[in-house]
Amino acid sequence: MQKRELIYEGKGKKMYATDDPNLLVAEFKDDLTAFDAQKRGNEAGKGALNNKISTQLFKLLESKGIVTDLVETISDTEQVVKKCEIIPLEVVVRNIATGSLSKRLGIKEGTVLPFTLVEFYYKNDDLHDPLVTDEHCIIMGLVKSEKDLQTLRHTAREINSILFKFFAERNLKLVDFKVEFGIDKDGNIILADEISPDSCRFWDATTNEKLDKDRFRQDLGSVKVAYEEVLRRILS
């Protein structure tokens, strides 16, 4: 397989075509962004850490029956992934109130939610990724059917159940996380993109120290040191 031209660049990754029409190369970047990219930074080694973390978590999920786009890791910062049509929704799973949920609804940060909350956000930078309802998703054609929304919600909850237990065993609270899904060449909905401290909130279960991108958002110290600690616990 040969890596070819750049076809897309996002905030955290570059996507390249290959000589196989069904495969892409995803390259993780060291760039950091927050607040709709109003705040920008860069920390050497961050991309490699996210690649390692996401690879480990996708392999864990695959072992539990969650189908993902991961094929193999080919370098410190690169993965081969299945080409799929990305569904234009960010699926956000929340276990503990913080961030936009606390700001939007006035729920005190750190409040443990009585059940896992799953929200959909429309992936649109111009609109600042607004929260959308099931009906909005159908009206706007973001998914093909109500059944697809049920699949997204069910799979997101399954992912949460697996990861929440996994991280609890490593003294980490999985506060919330964002996942994205795609439709593969056979029409199946599969987990895509990444699961990393860029897309999750992790708090140390003893101290509540934040070990994720909130360190960049809130100027809490080195992102790399925190991501290294998350990886260390994943591998422990």
Swiss-Prot record:
Read off the PROSITE patterns from this record.
SAICAR_SYNTHETASE_1
> Is Ligase set as a keyword in this record?
yes
- Tell me the Pfam families matching this sequence: SAICAR_synt
Judged by the first EC level, this protein's enzyme class is: ligase
Q: Which UniProt keywords apply?
A: ATP-binding, Ligase, Nucleotide-binding, Purine biosynthesis
Identify the metabolic or biological route this protein is part of.
Answer: Purine metabolism; IMP biosynthesis via de novo pathway; 5-amino-1-(5-phospho-D-ribosyl)imidazole-4-carboxamide from 5-amino-1-(5-phospho-D-ribosyl)imidazole-4-carboxylate: step 1/2
Gene Ontology BP annotations: 'de novo' IMP biosynthetic process; cobalamin biosynthetic process
Q: Which GO terms describe its molecular function?
A: ATP binding; phosphoribosylaminoimidazolesuccinocarboxamide synthase activity
Q: What is its EC number?
A: 6.3.2.6
Which domain of life, per UniProt? Bacteria
Q: Which reaction does it catalyse?
A: 5-amino-1-(5-phospho-D-ribosyl)imidazole-4-carboxylate + L-aspartate + ATP = (2S)-2-[5-amino-1-(5-phospho-beta-D-ribosyl)imidazole-4-carboxamido]succinate + ADP + phosphate + 2 H(+)
Q: Give the matching InterPro entries.
A: SAICAR_synt/ADE2_N (IPR028923), SAICAR_synt_PurC (IPR033934), SAICAR_synth (IPR001636), SAICAR_synthetase (IPR050089), SAICAR_synthetase_CS (IPR018236)
Q: Which NCBIfam families match?
A: purC
Supply the PANTHER family for this chain: MULTIFUNCTIONAL PROTEIN ADE2, SI:DKEY-6E2.2
> What is stated as this protein's family in its record?
Belongs to the SAICAR synthetase family.
Q: Which HAMAP family match?
A: SAICAR_synth (MF_00137)
Q: What is this protein identified as?
A: Phosphoribosylaminoimidazole-succinocarboxamide synthase
Taxonomic lineage is: Bacteria, Pseudomonadati, Campylobacterota, Epsilonproteobacteria, Campylobacterales
